[in-house]
A protein has these predicted regions:
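A detector for small-residue-rich transmembrane helices and their helix-helix packing motifs
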Residues: 1-213
């Protein structure tokens, strides 16, 4: 990937990365990014705080907080890797809308699933991270690639499906990863892109399927 003019191609992606880094440094300076109480204080996800105390803003703020340096490094690398392509495809404003709605959708999906299926986890889990929103970007790219006759710039439908599958598999097998939020973000981003993306060229589904397989 050529990063020489990244700031012109994807200013929103760079701004999101910068915001995440600023929030990370803030939580480190004012406590620790790996301290659960400190993260809760600055806006991490906690189900009962939303359902009982109506602190709905946590659905957004949690997406800008990270537990430790490796957590933010992994998420920001993926965002830089994927974000510029989708930002160029959608435009800056639509891309930002998709990112933020995916963050909310990811956190909401995870919270509701825990509330319905695992009340114990719902009551004791504090979570944070941009990965739900990043998976929204991946979901958006999946739709954009498929809708654009199986290719978007240097990305093919097959590449995107393999990448999405491997990323989701890593989340399922790694400890402490909220795979429910990943899935919620992926689906939210995919659906949002169905409404926001207007391809320059269109192809029939048989042609797209041939490129996938």
């Amino acid at each position: 990937m050529d990063f020489s003019d990244y700031h012109r191609r994807a200013p929103v992606t760079l701004a999101l990365v910068a915001l995440n880094i600023v929030f990370f440094l803030w939580t480190e300076v004012n406590g620790s990014s790996e301290d659960i109480q400190n993260m809760y204080r600055w806006g991490a996800m906690y189900g009962p705080a939303i359902t009982e105390d109506h602190e709905y803003w946590r659905l957004v703020t949690a997406a800008f907080l990270h537990f430790g340096i490796s957590h933010i490094a992994n998420n920001m690398f993926l965002l830089l890797l994927m974000g510029d392509r989708l930002e160029r495809a959608l435009g800056h404003v639509k891309y930002l809308i998709l990112y933020l709605v995916s963050a909310v959708g990811a956190n909401l999906f995870s919270m509701v699933l825990d509330l319905r299926l695992d009340p114990e986890t719902f009551c004791r889990t504090v979570s944070a991270g941009a990965s739900g929103a990043v998976f929204g970007v991946i979901g958006g790219l999946l739709w954009a690639v498929v809708r654009n006759r199986g290719r978007l710039e240097d990305l093919s439908a097959r590449q995107m499906m393999i990448f999405a599958g491997l990323s989701f598999y890593y989340g399922l097998t790694a400890a402490g990863v909220d795979s429910k939020a990943h899935f919620g973000g992926l689906v939210t981003g995919f659906v949002m892109c169905m409404f926001l993306y207007r391809p320059k060229r269109r192809g029939n589904w048989a042609e797209v399927w041939q490129k996938v397989i």
